[in-house]
Amino acid sequence: MSTTADIKAPAPPQPQQQQKMPGATSHMNPSPDHGETSYKGSGRLQGCAAIITGGDSGIGRAVAIAYAREGADVLISYFDEHDDAQETARWVTEAGRKAILVSGDIKQEAHCQELVERALEAFGRLDILVNNAAHQASFAKLEDISAEEWDVTFRTNVHSMFYLCKAAVPRMEPGSAIINTSSINAKSPSPTLLAYATTKGAIANFTAGLAQFIADRGIRVNAVAPGPIWTPLIPSTMPPEAVEGFGGNTPLGRAGQPAELAGVYVMLASNDSSYMTGALVPVTGGRPML
Protein backbone atom coordinates (compact mmCIF):
# COMPACT_ATOMS: atom_id res chain seq x y z
CA MET A 1 0.00 0.00 0.00
CA SER A 2 0.96 3.66 -0.32
CA THR A 3 0.78 6.32 2.35
CA THR A 4 -0.49 9.81 1.62
CA ALA A 5 2.94 11.22 2.34
CA ASP A 6 4.46 8.99 -0.36
CA ILE A 7 2.12 10.09 -3.16
CA LYS A 8 2.89 13.13 -5.29
CA ALA A 9 -0.41 15.05 -5.24
CA PRO A 10 0.02 18.73 -6.16
CA ALA A 11 -2.89 21.12 -5.68
CA PRO A 12 -4.17 23.27 -8.56
CA PRO A 13 -3.59 25.33 -10.51
CA GLN A 14 -2.15 22.94 -13.05
CA PRO A 15 -0.60 24.53 -16.15
CA GLN A 16 -3.18 25.05 -18.89
CA GLN A 17 -2.69 22.24 -21.40
CA GLN A 18 -4.53 20.31 -24.06
CA GLN A 19 -3.85 17.09 -25.94
CA LYS A 20 -5.50 15.18 -28.74
CA MET A 21 -7.67 12.28 -27.58
CA PRO A 22 -6.97 9.87 -25.97
CA GLY A 23 -3.95 11.69 -24.52
CA ALA A 24 -0.48 10.53 -23.49
CA THR A 25 0.95 10.29 -20.00
CA SER A 26 4.35 11.58 -21.08
CA HIS A 27 2.85 14.93 -22.16
CA MET A 28 1.07 15.65 -18.87
CA ASN A 29 2.29 18.40 -16.54
CA PRO A 30 2.58 17.51 -13.72
CA SER A 31 3.14 13.82 -14.31
CA PRO A 32 0.53 11.58 -12.67
CA ASP A 33 1.54 9.35 -9.77
CA HIS A 34 0.64 5.71 -10.43
CA GLY A 35 2.40 4.34 -7.37
CA GLU A 36 5.63 3.66 -9.26
CA THR A 37 7.75 4.51 -6.23
CA SER A 38 5.17 4.37 -3.46
CA TYR A 39 3.05 1.21 -3.74
CA LYS A 40 4.32 -1.70 -1.63
CA GLY A 41 2.63 -5.05 -2.08
CA SER A 42 1.94 -7.69 0.55
CA GLY A 43 1.00 -10.77 -1.51
CA ARG A 44 -2.76 -10.29 -1.34
CA LEU A 45 -3.25 -11.41 -4.97
CA GLN A 46 -0.48 -13.99 -5.13
CA GLY A 47 -0.92 -16.34 -8.08
CA CYS A 48 -3.95 -14.54 -9.49
CA ALA A 49 -4.47 -13.43 -13.09
CA ALA A 50 -6.23 -10.23 -14.14
CA ILE A 51 -7.53 -8.42 -17.21
CA ILE A 52 -7.48 -4.63 -16.96
CA THR A 53 -9.06 -2.62 -19.77
CA GLY A 54 -7.61 0.82 -20.23
CA GLY A 55 -4.56 -0.57 -18.45
CA ASP A 56 -2.09 1.54 -20.39
CA SER A 57 -2.44 4.74 -18.36
CA GLY A 58 -4.23 6.56 -15.56
CA ILE A 59 -6.20 4.47 -13.09
CA GLY A 60 -5.60 1.34 -15.17
CA ARG A 61 -1.83 1.72 -14.93
CA ALA A 62 -1.97 2.29 -11.18
CA VAL A 63 -4.11 -0.82 -10.75
CA ALA A 64 -1.77 -2.89 -12.95
CA ILE A 65 1.26 -1.83 -10.88
CA ALA A 66 -0.52 -2.57 -7.62
CA TYR A 67 -1.83 -5.95 -8.78
CA ALA A 68 1.63 -7.00 -9.97
CA ARG A 69 3.20 -6.00 -6.67
CA GLU A 70 0.49 -7.98 -4.88
CA GLY A 71 1.46 -11.06 -6.92
CA ALA A 72 -0.88 -11.08 -9.94
CA ASP A 73 -0.15 -11.51 -13.63
CA VAL A 74 -1.84 -8.87 -15.79
CA LEU A 75 -3.27 -8.65 -19.29
CA ILE A 76 -3.26 -4.97 -20.26
CA SER A 77 -6.02 -4.14 -22.74
CA TYR A 78 -5.72 -0.84 -24.60
CA PHE A 79 -6.71 0.83 -27.87
CA ASP A 80 -3.62 2.19 -29.64
CA GLU A 81 -1.59 4.01 -26.95
CA HIS A 82 1.41 1.73 -27.48
CA ASP A 83 4.04 3.81 -25.67
CA ASP A 84 1.92 4.12 -22.54
CA ALA A 85 1.07 0.42 -22.64
CA GLN A 86 4.73 -0.59 -22.94
CA GLU A 87 5.56 1.55 -19.92
CA THR A 88 2.84 -0.10 -17.84
CA ALA A 89 4.07 -3.54 -18.91
CA ARG A 90 7.59 -2.58 -17.84
CA TRP A 91 6.41 -1.86 -14.30
CA VAL A 92 4.49 -5.15 -14.15
CA THR A 93 7.49 -7.21 -15.27
CA GLU A 94 9.80 -5.33 -12.91
CA ALA A 95 7.54 -6.60 -10.12
CA GLY A 96 8.31 -10.13 -11.29
CA ARG A 97 4.95 -10.83 -12.91
CA LYS A 98 3.82 -11.57 -16.47
CA ALA A 99 2.44 -8.71 -18.56
CA ILE A 100 0.49 -9.38 -21.76
CA LEU A 101 -0.31 -6.42 -24.03
CA VAL A 102 -3.37 -6.65 -26.28
CA SER A 103 -4.42 -3.66 -28.36
CA GLY A 104 -7.77 -3.41 -30.07
CA ASP A 105 -11.30 -2.07 -30.00
CA ILE A 106 -13.37 -3.17 -26.99
CA LYS A 107 -16.49 -1.83 -28.73
CA GLN A 108 -16.36 -5.08 -30.71
CA GLU A 109 -17.66 -8.19 -28.96
CA ALA A 110 -15.22 -10.46 -30.80
CA HIS A 111 -12.27 -8.50 -29.43
CA CYS A 112 -13.63 -8.77 -25.89
CA GLN A 113 -13.91 -12.52 -26.32
CA GLU A 114 -10.33 -12.55 -27.61
CA LEU A 115 -9.12 -10.75 -24.46
CA VAL A 116 -10.52 -13.50 -22.27
CA GLU A 117 -9.03 -16.25 -24.44
CA ARG A 118 -5.62 -14.54 -24.51
CA ALA A 119 -5.59 -14.27 -20.72
CA LEU A 120 -6.47 -17.94 -20.31
CA GLU A 121 -3.81 -18.97 -22.83
CA ALA A 122 -1.14 -16.89 -21.11
CA PHE A 123 -2.01 -17.47 -17.46
CA GLY A 124 -4.14 -20.61 -17.39
CA ARG A 125 -6.78 -18.88 -15.26
CA LEU A 126 -8.75 -15.67 -14.86
CA ASP A 127 -9.47 -14.41 -11.36
CA ILE A 128 -10.02 -10.68 -11.78
CA LEU A 129 -11.69 -8.59 -14.48
CA VAL A 130 -11.31 -4.81 -14.22
CA ASN A 131 -13.58 -2.96 -16.65
CA ASN A 132 -11.85 0.41 -16.59
CA ALA A 133 -11.55 1.75 -20.15
CA ALA A 134 -13.69 4.78 -20.93
CA HIS A 135 -14.49 7.36 -23.57
CA GLN A 136 -15.25 10.92 -22.48
CA ALA A 137 -15.86 14.18 -24.31
CA SER A 138 -17.02 17.60 -23.13
CA PHE A 139 -19.66 19.68 -24.94
CA ALA A 140 -20.93 23.19 -24.26
CA LYS A 141 -24.37 22.60 -25.85
CA LEU A 142 -26.72 19.63 -26.24
CA GLU A 143 -26.90 20.27 -29.98
CA ASP A 144 -23.14 19.70 -30.25
CA ILE A 145 -23.43 16.05 -29.17
CA SER A 146 -23.76 13.94 -32.31
CA ALA A 147 -25.57 10.63 -32.44
CA GLU A 148 -22.24 9.05 -33.33
CA GLU A 149 -20.59 10.52 -30.22
CA TRP A 150 -23.42 9.22 -28.02
CA ASP A 151 -23.13 5.76 -29.58
CA VAL A 152 -19.33 5.61 -29.24
CA THR A 153 -19.54 6.58 -25.57
CA PHE A 154 -22.08 3.87 -24.78
CA ARG A 155 -20.33 1.20 -26.83
CA THR A 156 -16.99 1.93 -25.18
CA ASN A 157 -18.17 2.41 -21.61
CA VAL A 158 -21.18 0.08 -21.30
CA HIS A 159 -21.43 -2.39 -24.17
CA SER A 160 -17.82 -3.52 -23.74
CA MET A 161 -18.48 -4.20 -20.07
CA PHE A 162 -21.36 -6.51 -20.96
CA TYR A 163 -19.31 -8.25 -23.66
CA LEU A 164 -16.37 -8.85 -21.32
CA CYS A 165 -18.45 -10.04 -18.40
CA LYS A 166 -20.42 -12.40 -20.64
CA ALA A 167 -17.18 -13.89 -21.99
CA ALA A 168 -15.34 -13.99 -18.66
CA VAL A 169 -17.89 -15.20 -16.12
CA PRO A 170 -18.20 -18.79 -17.47
CA ARG A 171 -14.39 -19.08 -17.24
CA MET A 172 -14.03 -17.68 -13.71
CA GLU A 173 -13.98 -19.80 -10.56
CA PRO A 174 -15.81 -19.07 -7.28
CA GLY A 175 -13.89 -16.43 -5.37
CA SER A 176 -13.18 -14.40 -8.51
CA ALA A 177 -13.96 -10.70 -8.74
CA ILE A 178 -15.22 -8.21 -11.30
CA ILE A 179 -14.51 -4.53 -10.68
CA ASN A 180 -16.09 -1.81 -12.81
CA THR A 181 -15.00 1.81 -12.95
CA SER A 182 -18.01 4.09 -12.53
CA SER A 183 -17.67 7.76 -11.50
CA ILE A 184 -18.97 10.45 -9.18
CA ASN A 185 -20.89 11.43 -12.31
CA ALA A 186 -23.15 8.43 -11.69
CA LYS A 187 -24.80 10.37 -8.84
CA SER A 188 -23.70 13.96 -9.52
CA PRO A 189 -23.61 14.35 -13.31
CA SER A 190 -21.62 17.10 -14.96
CA PRO A 191 -23.88 18.62 -17.64
CA THR A 192 -21.03 19.15 -20.10
CA LEU A 193 -20.20 15.43 -19.82
CA LEU A 194 -23.76 14.27 -20.49
CA ALA A 195 -23.01 11.12 -22.49
CA TYR A 196 -20.16 10.05 -20.21
CA ALA A 197 -22.13 10.74 -17.03
CA THR A 198 -25.11 8.78 -18.32
CA THR A 199 -22.93 5.74 -19.00
CA LYS A 200 -21.44 5.94 -15.52
CA GLY A 201 -24.92 5.81 -14.01
CA ALA A 202 -25.62 2.78 -16.19
CA ILE A 203 -22.43 1.13 -14.92
CA ALA A 204 -23.50 1.57 -11.31
CA ASN A 205 -26.84 -0.07 -12.13
CA PHE A 206 -25.19 -2.83 -14.17
CA THR A 207 -22.87 -3.58 -11.25
CA ALA A 208 -25.70 -3.89 -8.75
CA GLY A 209 -27.75 -6.07 -11.08
CA LEU A 210 -24.93 -8.35 -12.20
CA ALA A 211 -23.78 -8.85 -8.60
CA GLN A 212 -27.16 -10.37 -7.79
CA PHE A 213 -27.37 -12.25 -11.09
CA ILE A 214 -24.14 -14.22 -10.58
CA ALA A 215 -23.86 -14.33 -6.78
CA ASP A 216 -24.70 -18.03 -6.80
CA ARG A 217 -21.52 -18.63 -8.82
CA GLY A 218 -19.38 -17.18 -6.05
CA ILE A 219 -18.18 -14.27 -8.20
CA ARG A 220 -18.32 -10.82 -6.64
CA VAL A 221 -19.06 -7.66 -8.66
CA ASN A 222 -18.31 -4.18 -7.34
CA ALA A 223 -17.65 -0.73 -8.75
CA VAL A 224 -15.36 2.17 -7.88
CA ALA A 225 -16.64 5.73 -8.31
CA PRO A 226 -13.65 8.05 -8.76
CA GLY A 227 -13.95 11.78 -8.37
CA PRO A 228 -11.60 14.11 -10.27
CA ILE A 229 -8.48 12.04 -10.99
CA TRP A 230 -5.43 13.34 -12.88
CA THR A 231 -5.28 11.08 -15.96
CA PRO A 232 -4.72 11.64 -19.71
CA LEU A 233 -8.50 11.88 -20.17
CA ILE A 234 -8.43 15.31 -18.53
CA PRO A 235 -6.11 17.33 -20.79
CA SER A 236 -7.38 15.44 -23.85
CA THR A 237 -11.12 16.05 -23.27
CA MET A 238 -11.41 19.30 -21.31
CA PRO A 239 -10.70 22.91 -22.29
CA PRO A 240 -7.39 24.32 -20.96
CA GLU A 241 -9.08 26.62 -18.44
CA ALA A 242 -10.95 23.64 -16.93
CA VAL A 243 -7.71 21.67 -16.72
CA GLU A 244 -6.08 24.52 -14.82
CA GLY A 245 -8.51 24.32 -11.91
CA PHE A 246 -9.25 20.59 -12.14
CA GLY A 247 -10.01 19.07 -8.74
CA GLY A 248 -10.02 22.38 -6.90
CA ASN A 249 -13.74 22.10 -6.09
CA THR A 250 -13.28 19.06 -3.82
CA PRO A 251 -13.12 19.41 -0.03
CA LEU A 252 -9.50 18.22 -0.23
CA GLY A 253 -8.85 21.02 -2.70
CA ARG A 254 -7.08 19.02 -5.39
CA ALA A 255 -7.40 16.26 -7.97
CA GLY A 256 -6.68 12.72 -6.91
CA GLN A 257 -3.77 10.74 -8.27
CA PRO A 258 -4.27 7.31 -9.86
CA ALA A 259 -2.15 5.80 -7.08
CA GLU A 260 -4.77 6.91 -4.56
CA LEU A 261 -7.33 4.51 -6.04
CA ALA A 262 -5.12 1.45 -6.46
CA GLY A 263 -5.64 0.19 -2.93
CA VAL A 264 -9.41 0.16 -3.39
CA TYR A 265 -9.10 -1.99 -6.51
CA VAL A 266 -6.78 -4.34 -4.63
CA MET A 267 -9.21 -4.61 -1.73
CA LEU A 268 -12.13 -5.37 -4.06
CA ALA A 269 -10.11 -8.05 -5.87
CA SER A 270 -8.87 -9.75 -2.70
CA ASN A 271 -10.43 -11.73 0.12
CA ASP A 272 -10.47 -8.52 2.16
CA SER A 273 -13.83 -7.82 0.49
CA SER A 274 -15.24 -11.33 0.64
CA TYR A 275 -18.64 -10.08 1.89
CA MET A 276 -18.88 -7.18 -0.55
CA THR A 277 -20.79 -7.43 -3.80
CA GLY A 278 -22.96 -4.94 -5.65
CA ALA A 279 -21.22 -2.01 -3.93
CA LEU A 280 -20.29 1.38 -5.38
CA VAL A 281 -17.20 2.64 -3.56
CA PRO A 282 -16.61 6.41 -3.81
CA VAL A 283 -13.07 7.82 -3.98
CA THR A 284 -13.94 11.46 -4.51
CA GLY A 285 -11.75 13.73 -2.41
CA GLY A 286 -14.68 14.37 -0.09
CA ARG A 287 -17.39 15.18 -2.63
CA PRO A 288 -20.49 13.36 -1.36
CA MET A 289 -22.31 10.57 -3.18
CA LEU A 290 -25.62 10.12 -1.38
Segment roles from a protein language model:
Residues 183:
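Residue(s) in the substrate-gating loop at a strand-loop-helix junction
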Residues 6-15, 28, 36-37, 139, ...:
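Short C-terminal tail/terminal secondary-structure segment
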Residues 82, 103-116, 147, 259-260:
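The beta1-alpha1 cofactor-binding region of Rossmann-like NAD(H)/NADP(H)-dependent oxidoreductases
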Residues 143-162, 179, 203, 252:
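Catalytic Tyr-X3-Lys loop
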Residues 165, 199, 207:
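Active-site helix of classical SDR
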Residues 13, 108, 113, 121, ...:
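Conserved mid-core segment of classical short-chain dehydrogenase/reductases
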